[in-house]
Amino acid sequence: MKEERAKDLVVRPWCISEIVNAHEDCPELQAVLEEYHKPVVIQDQVLGELTLDKDYDTFEGEIQWCGKDVSLSLEVNAESKPSWTRARNAAKRLVTDQETWDKAMRDFAAKNLTGLANNWLSQDEESARDPETAPITEEEFAQRILLTEVSVSPGGRFTAYYNDDDMFWGHAVEVSGSLKKGITYANLAG
């Protein structure tokens, strides 16, 4: 912000009024920058290797979910290690009881989205399947979706993203909830 514009503001923001030397070497700041760019990796017995993405405040990794590799994202405050622990603990609770959560998420998505899947099927001119005589059932819907990613927050909220098996022409099926309240939402994403 230019100095002449900032002078009339009640709260004056920082502004650069002059650059004395461009590209000045500063060993102290260089050391801070190098430390910032060092990778932060956590090894967890349940969740495996998790790497901090400082740009997005997430730890990223892969887990086994019902026999399949699934991406895991832990939403954290990169500057707050307690948030790392809370997010890891929440994710471990999901993973430890994954069969129960997987069935509940699939059933919830099927209950809430099967009608919409049949609506999309009726609009698919290339499909030989008639939703009037051979509709997608809730059981079929639940079996067809494939979990690809789980995102977990420190507070125990989670969102699971499923491949739609082209029932929605490539959109993801998104299922959200929390460890305390259970599954609360299912919709399309992407």
Which residue ranges define each predicted feature?
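C-terminal structured interaction module
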Residues: E138-G190
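Contiguous hydrophobic, core-forming segments of folded domains
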Residues: Y36-A104
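N-terminal start-of-chain detector that recognizes signal peptides
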Residues: Q43-L47, D130-A134, I145-E149
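Beta-strand elements of well-folded, non-transmembrane domains
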Residues: E3, G67, A78, D164-D166, ...
